[in-house]
Amino acid sequence: MKQILSLITFFFLFNVISSKHEGELYDAGRSTLINLNPMNFDTQITNNRNKNIISFIHFYSPDDGKSNELKEVFIELDKEYSGMFKLAGLNCKKYKDLCSKQGVTEFPTYKIYPPLPAPPMKYEGKIEPKKIISYLGRFVENKAQELNNNNFDDFISSKSSIPKVLLFTNKKGIPLIFKRLSLQFDVSKYIYY
């Protein structure tokens, strides 16, 4: 009887460990990262490309070795930039057909799904937050404009009922957050830098 119980316990533990190993890399309770599957891929990624949403997907196999090491970087990215970019993971051991359909054959693979009409593309850079954000920032449409002495008065006096957003800074260029914010406004003429 003890042998049978030991055998049952062994198989139970083996199944628990195996199912956890094949499970999702990202814990939904720990971040807003989306665990993709065949049921939600189109609604979460494909359909959002028409809405200026940039998605960054980590295609992985639970046993690929590197994904577990790089998981924390992806979670950190999600915490910092979840409102700007959609970050997701896709378990290719579980969903082989979907990964194959996306052209993924090795793991880990990182792909960017920029707004249409740009095609999805493989990210070849280092898996470091600053490098990834810098690369993703290239795909952010910019509707913000720089104010100067020639257009400031026109801006202030035009359409007084519409709220205006101003950023005063001594830095060159328009910050990524302002580029993303400018997309939330219907008319590009009302966000100035």
Feature-to-residue mapping (PLM):
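N-terminal leader/targeting and pre-domain segments
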Residues: I4-F56, E76, E80-K164, T169-K172, ...
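Active-site beta-to-alpha loop of glycosyltransferases that engages the nucleotide-sugar donor
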Residues: S61-P62
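Typically the conserved alpha-helix immediately C-terminal to a functionally engaged Cys/Sec
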Residues: G65-S82, K172-S188
